[in-house]
A protein has these predicted regions:
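Phosphate/anion-contacting hairpin/loop surfaces
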Residues: 70-157
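Extended, highly charged segments
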Residues: 1-57, 62-66, 88, 148
């Protein structure tokens, strides 16, 4: 499973290829990759959305679109490839996004464990799975925050 530094590296490498581009088409070749909404709704909602930014939260990749956030968890070994529009789909490419520059941005996952969630932008950090995550390593962690977290635990010492 990619750890946080690997996920951050993936994001860093994706930024020049996708930020500022618009999704003009989407094809889903393995429905189980799409966790929410249904694959049909996912495709309908994501087409026409512009990719405004990309970041991480935990091990999730968060792609901010016009109206939605696309959350992607790579799980065991998911990865992305850029291809020319119309290039043959390879065996383990399960989701394809066509961008407005005629580039095909593809999710590749041999084990098919990865997941994608399309969430209304205003709910990105309010609903599962992101709402269940703790602070990032670079967030300010205060003494009061730690005190509060420790005292809310109901675990035996």
């Amino acid at each position: 499973m990619p750890e946080k530094p690997e996920v951050m590296t993936v994001v860093k490498n994706l930024i020049p290829g996708i930020v500022g581009k618009r999704i003009t088409d989407c094809a889903i070749y393995w429905d189980n990759i799409i966790a929410s909404p249904t694959p049909k709704e996912f495709k309908k909602k994501i087409i026409g959305q512009k990719i405004n930014s990309i970041t991480t939260r935990g091990k999730f990749i968060v792609i901010e679109l016009d109206d939605y956030s696309l959350l992607i968890h790579l799980r065991m070994e998911g990865k992305f490839f850029f291809r020319n529009k119309g290039d043959e789909i390879t065996k383990h490419e399960h989701v394809e996004f066509i961008l407005d520059n005629e580039i095909s941005f593809r999710y590749h996952d041999v084990r098919k464990f990865g997941k994608m969630y399309l969430i209304p932008k205003e709910d990105t950090y309010k609903v599962k799975p992101l709402s269940e995550l703790g602070k990032e390593f670079y967030d300010d962690i205060t003494e009061d925050y730690l005190f509060d977290k420790i005292h809310k635990l109901k675990l035996p010492i």
